[in-house]
């Protein structure tokens, strides 16, 4: 069985996700789709000869030749060009989507042969699919943490609707009473400085360390940090939460479904309210959690300097139970089931 994929090859969530499946041997053939924001593609991630799609449409003689030997096309979140999966069906190629519920269209223009849902929340949105968790990447190494001393937030490129809660975390710094050591990592510093200006922190507030630039996951979740803070507003799948936990960090995120089903509950941040929204017009309606900066600050103060070894050990168990060795065969069986 030959499994094709069209994907980003960038040091961001979808790029890392596709590379993980390729490195595990689930995906056999790749077309790289150039990121619309101009983020460089890491063509070296894939074999020599892998082509890069530089237009919005996925069509043409090279694409047709690519499909000649493909049995199943696997997509992550989006096919980029909705005409392409329809063309796959015309060519007799099966289509499988690993969806991110918040980015799925209310009126999709293609009927996928199978949904492989990465979270229990995605399973609720796509009940005809099957739920298989995303495995932890092998390069995520576990390190024992014993005390909550150094806190980390990964803002990335901020994301749609500030869904990572970066602005709320920054606003919380005005209310933190303890001596907090917080680092915020981001792709580009402009976005963080804009949020810092918007937050209007008073004199004397905690000043975070800002580190900008592309970073590999193994560097992000290294032993330098003890606690990962991410007051996320929505998400079914969150690779940073998963990888931080698997690396041995204590994870402080919003107490919401489905992350509260697999993360330790004690450090989770209470939700002030919930509302129904859309990430963009035409997409599925979703529930968004609202978190109060004062509550975030109280949680940071509560855990700063506290013992966290039991959470670190739980992360080690999670890493073992959610390895590629545990789940690769389930993905292969799911893909074979559509043939």
Annotate the PLM regions.
Residues 193-216:
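Nucleotide-activated donor-binding/catalytic signature segment of Leloir-type glycosyltransferases, i.e.
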Residues 287-296, 304-336:
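A charged, aromatic-enriched C-terminal amphipathic alpha-helix characteristic of glycosyltransferases
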Residues 140-164, 170-177, 183:
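Conserved donor-binding/catalytic core segment of Leloir-type glycosyltransferases
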Residues 250-253, 260, 270:
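Short hydrophobic beta-strand element within catalytic cores of glycosyltransferases
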């Amino acid at each position: 069985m030959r499994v094709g994929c069209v994907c980003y090859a960038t040091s961001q969530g979808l790029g890392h996700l596709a590379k993980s499946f390729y490195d595990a041997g689930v995906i056999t053939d790749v077309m790289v789709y150039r990121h619309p924001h101009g983020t460089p593609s890491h063509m070296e991630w894939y074999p020599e000869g892998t082509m890069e799609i530089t237009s919005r449409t996925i069509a043409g003689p090279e694409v047709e030749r690519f499909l000649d030997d493909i049995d199943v096309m696997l997509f992550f979140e989006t096919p980029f060009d909705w005409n392409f999966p329809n063309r796959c069906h015309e060519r007799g190629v099966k289509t499988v989507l690993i969806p991110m519920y918040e980015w799925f269209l209310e009126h999709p223009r293609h009927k996928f042969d199978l949904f492989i849902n990465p979270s229990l929340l995605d399973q609720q949105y796509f009940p005809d699919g099957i739920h298989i968790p995303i495995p932890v990447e092998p390069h995520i190494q576990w390190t024992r943490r014993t005390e909550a001393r150094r806190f980390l937030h990964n803002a990335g490129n901020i994301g749609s609707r500030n869904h990572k809660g970066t602005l709320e975390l920054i606003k919380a710094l005005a209310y933190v009473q303890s001596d907090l050591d917080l680092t915020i990592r981001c792709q580009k510093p402009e976005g963080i400085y804009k949020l810092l200006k918007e937050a209007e922190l008073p004199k004397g507030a905690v000043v975070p360390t800002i580190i900008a630039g592309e970073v590999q996951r193994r560097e992000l979740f290294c032993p330098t940090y003890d606690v990962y803070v991410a007051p996320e507003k929505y998400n079914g799948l969150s690779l940073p939460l998963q990888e931080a936990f698997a690396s041995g960090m204590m994870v402080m995120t919003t107490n919401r479904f489905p992350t509260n089903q697999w993360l330790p509950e004690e450090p989770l941040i209470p939700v002030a309210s919930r509302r129904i929204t859309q990430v963009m017009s035409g997409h599925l309606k979703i529930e968004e959690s609202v978190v109060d900066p004062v509550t975030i600050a109280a949680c940071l103060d509560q855990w700063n300097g506290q013992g966290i070894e039991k959470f670190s050990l739980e992360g080690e168990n999670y890493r073992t139970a959610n390895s590629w060795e545990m789940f690769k065969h389930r993905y292969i069986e799911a893909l074979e089931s559509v043939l």
